Amino acid sequence: MRRQIKFQLFVLLLSFSLCAQNQYYLSSSTGNDNNDGSQAQPWKTLSKISNTSLGPGDTVYFKKGDTFRGHFVVDGSGTEENLITFTSYGSGNQPIISGSDHDDGGGDYREAILVTNHDNMVFDGLEIQNHRTIPRSDVGDLVSFGIRVEVISSNVNLNNFSFRNMTFKNVYALFGINTSDYTDINIYQQAFNAFEVSGLTFFSSDGGIINNVIVEDSYFTDLQRIGVHVKNAAAKTSDKRNTNFVFRNNEFFQIGGTCVLPVRTENCLIENNIFNQPGAKTNDKMIGRGSAVWNWFSINTIVQYNQVINAKGIMDSHGIHVDHSNVDTFIQYNYMQDCEGGFVEILGGNQRAVYRFNISVNDGWRHQDNYNLLRWPNSDHTIWLNNKVWGSEEDHPSHDSYIYNNTVVINKSGNEAFDTAIDIKGKNTRIFNNIFYANNGSGIGNQQGNYNDPNLLMTNNLFHGNISNHFRNLDSNRVDINSDFSNEEIGYQNEFQINLSSQSINAGTAYAGDYAHPAIPVNASDIFANVEEYPTVDFFSNSLSGDSTPNIGASNAKSREIKLLNKTKPTINKVYIQNHMISEKVILYGVNKSYTYALVDILGRTKQSGFLEANKEEIILDESLISGIYVLKLSDQTNTITSKIVVNKSSFSPDY
């Protein structure tokens, strides 16, 4: 309890400083560096504020609507009780701070804002850019950052950073990369790794640690490679890691590579984010390759309640993947759709990598013919467990991987139909209680199958359609069905939601013995205070508690009639939703009075609303509504009832 209170106190301190000290105002349009820095007489340049020593409780204000070009080097630290705050004043658009297109001479800077060996600070309501086009003598050509926080001294710990309501966009190095420029995949990989470009970077030299970071309610777009990059330069054998990172309620749109990349972190929580088109290639400079999230040499990484749409790229580019040598990675309650690489990717050297209660729709459509470098038959996967780590020819199989209670659907047809590979090279892998569904000419596991785990435990999975027979036969207690999913014959809903007679209800194996839930190490950090050690609900918040006969798949609903609930008054207003999985319209039962309705996305934004008359039992989805996770709210004059739904408007396209 004391640990939880301490973390909550830090969050509270982000909202206000207990003892505000100096206030500095800057305006690039009306300021002058000879002014006194007050709101009435603001300074003008980043150089002026860079040469000002800041202390605990200080606040730096940038004028909204202004653009500040150059290099802001933060000089000074706050304390845990009195943070330094960087924010805005006035009206209009967020102030822009850019390290490029300035008149300082000497070329574009490596980053717009640099924090070196300073800590205890808040960045709130700023827009950060850094599109480098002019070389600088002390900066590599393939490097660019928006904000860089760094420890460059051994055994120095930096604490308490908050980034909220921020925008990171238009961050590029001098040059780009295109797969067509290479004829060797290894040379391409080296070139890819050489790009150090991100909107927000945390870097620790050997022996240094950055601790207690929150990035929330922020927007990332038009970035050449990475949204947020956390790095620690400690040796592989070292136990030094950056600690306690939280990324929540952020939106990432058209990022050239990965959205969130934790490298050598311990305790990282990534939740309630929208990842839309990672691995984008909207211009020649963009990298064009990336899973939304992947981790490397990290401990205790929880990735939950996110949505990933349309990840692309020549390699990786799954929705969320587990890279090399991690311990306790939990990927749960996420929705992934149209991700080019596939669904599950667990590379070598991991312990307890877990995919559970996720929904995957049309993931794994990559074709090797789309890339001149790629000539391997398993380039796209439904499940991929690799036993290799980068830089080693030895086998490093991952131990105790769990893949359970996921719903996996591939239903593209015609020229868009595709099949996937399944490769399992691990130790003590468990695959149970999953739905694998393929139809319309698409398939799962027929492209290639490699199964190299003598201790593979696979049971109580449901198979429908064109699924590899080899994969099916590995299941000791499989459920084979023809379609028993709701509304397939009608065609106005997605065909992969269970209905009353579905054979997936109560058909799963119990969570006991070899199939017991792996525990999340929630006591390892305060950031996990609201994370459950063991799951008690399914993807749609249906209860799992005490269930000795769970369903197969991501939904544990026991009937077709799924009630919208008021959690504090669960017996009122018995309105039912026919289907959690929606493509064109929401079908309801029991609408015996009028309601206002709203569809709210995972960032809390109302994306569609209207009026539902009594006895009208359908809501037509707006064409502009994108795929993802929503909460449906029905409200009358006294009460509000809700249900979680998934909207699947597949935007499958193999072309950028």
Q: What function would you assign to each model-found segment?
A:
Residues I505-L564:
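Surface beta-loop-beta hairpin patches that serve as ligand-binding interfaces in beta-rich domains
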Residues S29-N34, G65-T67, G78, G90-N93, ...:
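Acidic glycine-/aspartate-rich tracts in secreted/extracellular proteins
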Residues M1-N22, P654-D655:
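Bacterial Sec-dependent N-terminal signal peptides
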Residues Y25, Y61, T596-V600:
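Beta-strand signatures of extracellular beta-sandwich domains
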Residues H71, D103-V115, Q129-L158, K169-N212, ...:
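Glycine- and acidic/polar-rich repeat regions and solenoidal domains
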Residues S28-K63, T67, S502, F540, ...:
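Acidic Gly/Asp/Thr-rich repetitive segments characteristic of extracellular carbohydrate-active
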Residues K569-Y656:
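C-terminal outer-membrane/trafficking sorting elements
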Residues Q23, T52-S98, L114-E127, S153-T167:
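Beta-solenoid repeat scaffold
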